[in-house]
Amino acid sequence: MTAPDDNSIITATAPAEVYDKKNPFPSNLKRRVLLNKEGSDKETIHLEMCLAGSGLEYRPGDSLAIIPTNSTQVVEQVIEAGGFDAGETVELKDGATKPLNEAFASDLDINGVTKNILKKYNALAQSEKLESLLDPGNKAALDDYLWGREVIDMLTDFPVPGLSASDFCGTLRKQLPRLYSIASSPKAHPDEVHLTIAVVRYHSHDRDREGVCSTYTADRVSEGETMPVYVHISRTFKLPEDGDTPIIMVGPGTGIAPFRAFVEERDAIGATGKSWLFFGDQHRATDYLYGDEWERYVGDGKLSRIDLAFSRDQEHKVYVQHRMLEHAAEMYSWLSDGAVFYVCGDAS
């Protein structure tokens, strides 16, 4: 080992920052596109997000976790329903303190209600009506109540005069990340990750309601702004190592996302294995997600076959399972030849 002379400069390289669930990466939203055409009953968006400088790596089949914030409207509604002071300082379970409106916006899940949350809340409410609902003999009634209801419903249905904001926060879960199947190949889109998200908006129990994360990505983050994200690795949902292996992919609705990544990846590496895609949605004219891409892949021979099922384009509804039954013999032949079978379902 040689000692440096007096003019030498010794530099140390700082360890690269690791981005994960505890330390998410602020990913810049580069582009957001509505995939459905005019006249559709659905709202499905395509996101392109920047990962440059993050050190985050993913493979087709992995998911991207997004940690959303709650909408200002919902925060204000919950504060009003509970009779709280928005600026009151509250202590969270991790010991942190902050104004209530900030805690509701980013730290706590102020939407979904569970049986456990109702139990914790009733320790404060001491409501006979809620106690009856929680009785083991009333399971059907409890399940019915929990369906489609949220924290604001709990506050209005079982009000507690003078409820402590800090005590109430103790009944809630922390804001959880939402996982979305990645819809891109890093080989096709270096330093980017793409997502396909169904935006949830509906009316239930006399109120307009919305999906927390889907509307966060659609409404509350503008292009050029950032979202906290990290990669969730899949140990099982991945392409076969051998590019000659045939694959069958079934992805109705937003279930198409990982298969866009699969086809892009196989195209990028020059895989020669056959590929067969089943896709379905409501109407071909308005809901054929990434339709131009699929048609191009088929035309170029990069996708061996595609079978489509648009449920509302004829009098009797047709779904992907019907197309699979129609081609059962050929599917069996593919599987006998070693094809790997994948299904990614649309939650709806």
Task: Indicate where each model-derived feature is located.
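FNR-like FAD-binding dehydrogenase module
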Residues: 1-348
